[in-house]
């Protein structure tokens, strides 16, 4: 790549001298976001694994039957999906599964609880983030990238 080509590509930045910094930090920011989302899912999934009967009661209490099936799926998706996101392993399927869980929570808050956007706001934000990883993959710093395979 010539200097002229590099400079014309940097013209999109208000301060072109920052382009190398952006290029270096963008993959780190993407990794940080993926890890934070993964940790959040692990934190939400762990109590459901520790107290499966409580998880069954919770999902049945909001209308999902059979409770044992939905509680198991929810706990596994949150906990193990979170671990996969943290590692950046099987990122697309893990992110797709967590996106589905979040879309169910959006529906629940919006329709079932009649809270509209106010109740579903955080789920919409998190679903947007997990959808990003479902479509784009884990990024540079991930096990997926290390092994050279992505689904």
Regions found by a protein language model. Give the residues of each.
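Extended, low-polarity transmembrane helix blocks
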Residues: 1-50, 68-76, 80-83, 87-151
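Membrane-interface interhelical connector segments
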Residues: 50-66
């Amino acid at each position: 790549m010539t200097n002229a080509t590099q400079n014309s590509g940097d013209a999109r930045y208000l301060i072109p001298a920052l382009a190398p910094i952006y290029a270096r930090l963008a993959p780190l920011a993407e990794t940080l976001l993926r890890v934070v989302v993964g940790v959040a899912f692990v934190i939400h999934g762990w109590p459901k694994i520790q107290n499966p009967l409580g998880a069954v009661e919770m999902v049945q209490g909001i209308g999902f039957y059979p409770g044992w099936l939905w509680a198991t799926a929810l706990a596994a998706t949150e906990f193990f999906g979170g671990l996969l996101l943290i590692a950046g392993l099987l990122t697309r399927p893990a992110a797709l599964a967590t996106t589905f869980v979040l879309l169910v929570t959006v529906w629940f808050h919006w329709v079932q609880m009649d809270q509209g956007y106010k109740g579903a706001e955080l789920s919409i934000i998190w679903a947007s983030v997990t959808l990003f990883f479902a479509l784009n993959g884990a990024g540079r710093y991930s096990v997926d990238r290390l092994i050279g395979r992505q689904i």
